Amino acid sequence: KKNIKEAIDLLEKNKKDLDFLLLLIKIYYSIGETEKGAAVLKEAIEKNINHPRFNTSLSLRLLFKGDFENGFKLYENRSSKNKNYFKDIKEWNGENLRNKSIIVYNEQGLGDAIQFSKYLIPLSKIAQNIKFFVQDSIFDLFDNKINNLKISSKKSIDNNVADFKITLGSLIKFFYNKKINTNELSIKVEEKNKNYFKKIVNKNKLNVGLVWSGFIYGSGQPYRSIQLEKFKKILNLDANFFCLQNEVWEDDLPFFKKSKLKNYGHLNLKDITALIENLDLIVTVDTLFLHLASSLNKETWALLCIDPDWRWGELNKF
């Protein structure tokens, strides 16, 4: 607490500097001091700071609270959107797509590609020629049998011609409030894989998939991880528990080795997806598995920090 107070004091004295200002706001929200964070943010807004990084930070706050109209406008300032893909293709801003082609590409993380790919479904109702580019590592997760939609990996991203382009993150603003038929999932599960794990999973007990930590050097750490031993009481329940993550931190290894967790973290994502389909519940911190399990309409309990990502805010009411 002393170190946090010293950091806040230093940042408060130097908040005229954008880096200090953004970090100060982030710290206030991260430690649950939301009123102080909001006050600093309001003060900055009144100064009419017009910088892409500040606008992006503000957009995340607005989106979390549900101010989608203003939030998505400012969200266009995010640095990930400004990668120079398809520079000669016009950006789509809601124009009529009849007899037109459009490229959608994921410019953010794997979880975003999985979670937000559902917005390709309503797009496919108004466009007859959609090409969706995703990271190579998750290409096989997507269903290539959806009408008007072709899934492509990023390794084939060069020399593609279309009438329009849009990032997946920007596509959300057009369809976030549309009801999407959950039977038209963009994520596929191969039946033979699903049946294989059906034979392995003992249905005489509750079957729970558990993810308690992410990549140790990943974004948002350590706020996206929980010490495994804190699940001790839960793991003593009369249920089957499956480890889905492929990395166990060194501090967790002693408890992990003596726990009754069944380790399936070595599986590839296609197999993990099939396993999840056979489980009753997924309990996970904010990692790829939260996006994946919820996108499969599996009952999913999210273990979130005090100041979670905007994706887990008001957007989830739609």
Write out the residue ranges for each language-model feature.
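Alpha-helical solenoid repeat scaffolds of the TPR/TPR-like class and their adjacent stem/linker regions
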Residues: 1-281, 286-318
